[in-house]
């Protein structure tokens, strides 16, 4: 049996070795080797989320929150903040399962659903919010250092903030590998600081500073809210909400993860759950052991509770630095993705990256300058509402993205499930190539980047599609070679064209089908039935006593059967491809994603924005409208997004119209194709027939032949 020589790429062996080589873990990589570094669930997503959630607000404002809202309402406020963040995380997970998230994180997620114009607007506001949040974290760190050193001057606080910002800028420019290594160390120190606070609440007292220990009377006194002058539930909520703004940090790491489809959901949900538990512990312990006056006016009351005060201060400093570093990591990469997609042409220079991980040096410098500008504001309580409004607007966009994507997918009509008959044989020469892919959150590692779009991958697909064997010449007996009649020679000349076509595509017509069950279930029913009937007839003919020359002509009935149902098959295949966009993977967190909960979260977040600071909300919406129309004028050719067919206002109108009896339902409209009766069309032949090439077969010539015309000849 002879084997056909396969077409190989020039360096296909090296490409195969690179594709099969697994990326090394980050701790095994050499420090000064220029190679991309990818991370996993716990060292990448979980660490980044926890570092961003455990910020200045936890260490400096938890006691102030308990002193104003009390223990009971404080727990409710913390749970409500975490719930708003959890709804957004689940919405992001739902979008990631139905769509794809690139290296742009939040921007890529919103842009793929709502379009580049909306995604660019929300992405720029999110970057701005990250810069303001970084300034808030650095300011909190500088305030603590200045109090520790006895420096009450505001310029001392600003000088310390600028120095810390420059140090973090250097770490970010060094690469993501150093950021993750530093984050692991900082997370360990934060755990030690939290343990020191919990142990200190049991081991000692400090009545002079309001730490009097556990007392039922004290806990009862601190249970109900008692606000300071000028404070309310929503002002406290506005100050405390930035504590949960780090939940989207895992989505911003999509380009630096080995398996983003599995790492982002698991790491983000684990970080949210552990953070909620630790926040509840802090609120309960502070309300049970400290007086209300100390909780209100002493921002460092938790430092008096700790067993070793310097460990708590170390955790405060580390949390401030880590949260700011997380903002300096995510914001430049979002800005880089916006620049690479040319959403705003003026920012195209920020799309360049250096190193194997494409570190956005220019974007890091720009975000650092914006952060430095807000450092000079110098007050945490002033910066916190600005951060809250920007992040709440981003959460509204993410929640609405998942809702619109779900509603758009529900509006699709389902494709009928294919029914396969037992014992039926199908095509062996064409397996289904629309294999279901896992949801992509960004980079899939170097393995896929090597294979995608290369000749090696094309050859692999062709090997799967066509069995590269020539069983026809070796398996069929050669009979009657010596006594050939003119009729057999004529029959051989007739099949020359079809035999050449068969050899060109290397069809193996006698091989049994090899469709996997899970792949065959996704093929259209009409296509399966047509192929079964065609190939069942051919199998029965090939097993009979037929001459050698008629075997190649069995391809003609197959082409005839397929040409009759080609229109219906094309429609079903196109509908199948359209519905593949909305297929969801099954996992334990898939059932937690609900579009109606996302819609409720979007509406609730929008209302909370107006209640906290309606002035900041109106300013943000005005800026968003200006940026939106500017992007529409500067880049009019941006994609519309996966949910462009869904309109919230049309959906609301369709719900409200049946309830309004006075309004008539819209009449059905039918669009008719224009008639072309006045246009005459005729076919002509460009080259005239002559005797110069009479002996040459007619290649590249097609004709439509009915089954009835062919049957008398065979």
UniProtKB/Swiss-Prot annotation:
Transmembrane segments: 37-60, 72-93, 99-116, 123-142, 154-173, 185-205, 233-254, 266-289, 309-331, 360-377, 383-403, 593-616, 622-643
Entry's disease: SLC12A8 has been identified as a possible susceptibility gene for psoriasis mapped to chromosome 3q21 (PSORS5).
Any one Gene Ontology cellular component term annotated for this protein: membrane
Pfam families the UniProt entry points to: AA_permease
Superkingdom of origin: Eukaryota
Gene giving rise to this polypeptide: SLC12A8
Function summary: Cation/chloride cotransporter that may play a role in the control of keratinocyte proliferation.
Summary of the tissues where the protein is detected: Ubiquitous with very low level in normal skin.
InterPro entries assigned to the protein according to its UniProt record, in alphabetical order: AA-permease/SLC12A_dom, SLC12A_fam
Glycan-carrying positions: 221
Locations listed in the record: Membrane
Membrane topology recorded in Swiss-Prot or TrEMBL: Multi-pass membrane protein
UniProt entry tagged with the keyword Membrane: yes
Protein name (record): Solute carrier family 12 member 8
One function term, GO molecular function aspect: potassium:chloride symporter activity
């Amino acid at each position: 049996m002879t084997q056909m020589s396969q077409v190989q790429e020039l360096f296909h062996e090296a490409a195969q070795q690179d594709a099969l080589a697994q990326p090394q873990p980050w701790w095994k990589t050499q420090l000064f080797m220029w190679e991309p570094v990818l991370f996993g669930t716990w060292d990448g997503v979980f660490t980044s989320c926890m570092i961003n959630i455990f910020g200045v607000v936890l260490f400096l404002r938890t006691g102030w929150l308990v002193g104003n809202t009390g223990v009971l309402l404080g727990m409710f406020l913390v749970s409500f903040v975490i719930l708003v963040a959890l709804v957004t995380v689940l919405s992001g997970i739902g979008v990631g399962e139905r769509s794809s998230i690139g290296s742009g994180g939040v921007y890529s997620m919103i842009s793929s659903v709502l379009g580049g114009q909306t995604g660019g607007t929300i992405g720029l506001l999110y970057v701005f919010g990250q810069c303001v949040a970084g300034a808030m974290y650095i300011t909190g760190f500088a305030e603590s250092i200045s109090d520790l050193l006895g420096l009450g001057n505001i310029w001392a606080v600003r000088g310390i903030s600028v120095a810390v910002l420059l140090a973090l800028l250097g770490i970010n420019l060094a690469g993501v590998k150093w950021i993750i290594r530093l984050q692991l160390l900082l997370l360990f120190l934060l755990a030690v600081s939290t343990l020191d606070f919990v142990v200190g609440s049991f081991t000692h007292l400090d009545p002079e500073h309001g730490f009097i220990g556990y007392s039922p009377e004290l806990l009862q006194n601190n249970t109900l809210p008692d606000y300071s002058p000028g404070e309310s539930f929503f002002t406290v909520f506005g100050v405390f909400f930035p504590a949960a703004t780090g939940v989207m940090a895992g989505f911003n790491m999509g380009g630096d993860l080995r398996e983003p489809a599995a790492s982002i959901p698991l790491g983000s949900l684990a970080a949210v759950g552990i953070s909620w538990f630790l926040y509840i512990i802090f609120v309960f312990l502070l309300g049970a052991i400290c007086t209300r006056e100390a909780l209100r006016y002493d921002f460092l009351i938790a430092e008096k509770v700790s067993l070793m005060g310097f460990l708590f201060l170390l955790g405060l400093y580390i949390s401030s630095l880590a949260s700011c570093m997380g903002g300096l990591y995510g914001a430049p990469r979002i800005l880089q993705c916006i620049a690479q997609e040319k959403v705003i042409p003026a920012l195209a220079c920020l799309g360049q990256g250096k190193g194997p991980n494409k570190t956005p040096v220019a974007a890091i410098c720009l975000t650092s300058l914006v952060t430095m500008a807000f450092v000079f504001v110098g007050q945490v309580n002033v910066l916190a509402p600005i951060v809250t409004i920007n992040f709440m607007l981003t959460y509204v966009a993410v929640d609405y993205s998942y809702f619109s994507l779900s509603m758009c997918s529900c509006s699709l009509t389902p494709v009928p499930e294919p029914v396969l008959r037992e014992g039926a044989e199908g095509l062996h020469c064409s397996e289904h190539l629309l294999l279901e892919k896992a949801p992509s959150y960004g980079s899939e590692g170097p393995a896929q980047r090597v294979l995608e779009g290369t000749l090696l991958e094309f050859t692999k697909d062709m090997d799967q599609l066509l069995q590269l064997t020539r069983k026809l010449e070796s398996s069929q007996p050669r009979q009657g070679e010596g006594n050939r009649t003119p009729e057999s020679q004529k029959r051989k000349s007739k099949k020359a064209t079809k035999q050449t076509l068969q050899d060109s595509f290397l069809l193996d017509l006698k091989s049994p089908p090899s469709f996997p069950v899970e792949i065959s279930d996704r093929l259209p029913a009409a296509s399966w039935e047509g192929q079964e009937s065609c190939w069942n007839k051919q199998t029965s003919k090939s097993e009979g006593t037929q001459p050698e020359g008629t075997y190649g002509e069995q391809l003609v009935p197959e082409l005839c059967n397929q040409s009759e149902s080609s229109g219906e098959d094309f429609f079903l295949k196109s509908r199948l491809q359209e519905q593949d966009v909305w297929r969801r993977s099954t996992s334990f967190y898939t059932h937690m994603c609900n579009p109606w909960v996302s819609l409720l979260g979007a509406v609730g977040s929008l209302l909370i924005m107006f209640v906290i600071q309606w002035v900041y909300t109106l300013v943000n919406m005005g800026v968003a409208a200006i940026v939106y129309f500017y992007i529409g004028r500067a880049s009019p050719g941006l994609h519309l997004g996966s949910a462009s067919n869904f309109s919230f206002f049309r959906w609301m109108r369709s719900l409200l119209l049946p309830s309004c009896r006075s309004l008539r339902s819209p009449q059905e409209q039918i669009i008719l194709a224009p008639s072309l009766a006045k246009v005459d069309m005729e076919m002509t032949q460009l080259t005239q027939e002559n005797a110069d090439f009479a002996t040459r077969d007619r290649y590249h010539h097609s004709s439509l032949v009915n089954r009835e015309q062919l049957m008398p000849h065979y």
